[in-house]
């Protein structure tokens, strides 16, 4: 079975210090990076990968003032970038979705999770537990009483949608290998690799455990050798320029 359509859905932008994308650089220059959600249309129903930024980031570039990342992370989010508004533009309401897949629980990937009261939210146990106790996770990204589906390790969500446990950027990060009708296999590294440079040249970037992150990149390289997928990175400005976005699909 394959995924009928894979949509790239823009979900705002984020200014991030370039040293977060390349740890060998001296902090002080901000990059304007894309924030993505991904919509999968499958035989079983629609699946959303990541939910963008939280409502607290709307028109609030100073969201992280007074924190350890002040001046290094500046969200650029409008009302239109709220996940409920994004879904409306693509023809869905929150209750229509079969699953939410949280690649990890950082603010630009899980900020909209609270819009999904009943929809199962698939997240790695290591990520769920880390988010309970670390200041780098916003409360909007780890709300209680949501319908969390806790998994451990690799996991097939539906036929054609495989989660790959790729820790390092965070303790429980997961990437996706998707078999699409139109384009064949597609690998979404998400934040296991921000950019092509991180992936191909193994340039270090921001994360919880740099050695673990490198191990995950090496693992994904093995997947690429075996499956020959199209590879999309988490926040690659160069790749964004040629990316097909909704209503186009791959």
Curated annotation (Swiss-Prot):
Key words, A-Z: Hydrolase, Metal-binding, Zinc
Keyword Metal-binding: yes
Annotated Pfam families: Lactamase_B
pH dependence remark: Optimum pH is 8.0 with 3-oxo-C8-HSL as substrate. Activity increases with increase in pH from 6.0 to 8.0, and declines slightly at pH 9.0. Little or no activity at pH 5.0 or below.
Entry EC number(s): 3.1.1.81
Protein residues bound to Zn(2+) 1: 104, 106, 169, 191
Catalytic activity: an N-acyl-L-homoserine lactone + H2O = an N-acyl-L-homoserine + H(+)
A GO molecular function held by the record: acyl-L-homoserine-lactone lactonohydrolase activity
Cofactor dependency: Zn(2+)
Residues binding Zn(2+) 2: 108-109, 191, 235
Source taxon at top rank: Bacteria
Temperature-activity note from the record: Stable below 37 degrees Celsius, activity decreases sharply after incubation for 2 hours at 45 degrees Celsius.
SMART domains reported in the protein's UniProt record: Lactamase_B
EC class name: hydrolase
Note describing how the cofactor binds: Binds 2 Zn(2+) ions per subunit.
PANTHER family named in the record: METALLO-HYDROLASE RV2300C-RELATED (PTHR42978:SF7), QUORUM-QUENCHING LACTONASE YTNP-RELATED-RELATED (PTHR42978)
The family this protein is said to belong to: Belongs to the metallo-beta-lactamase superfamily.
The protein's assembly and partners: Monomer.
Task of the protein: Hydrolyzes acyl homoserine lactones with varying lengths of acyl chains, with a slight preference for substrates without 3-oxo substitution at the C3 position. Has only residual activity towards non-acyl lactones, and no activity towards non-cyclic esters.
Protein name per Swiss-Prot or TrEMBL: N-acyl homoserine lactonase
Organism: Bacillus sp
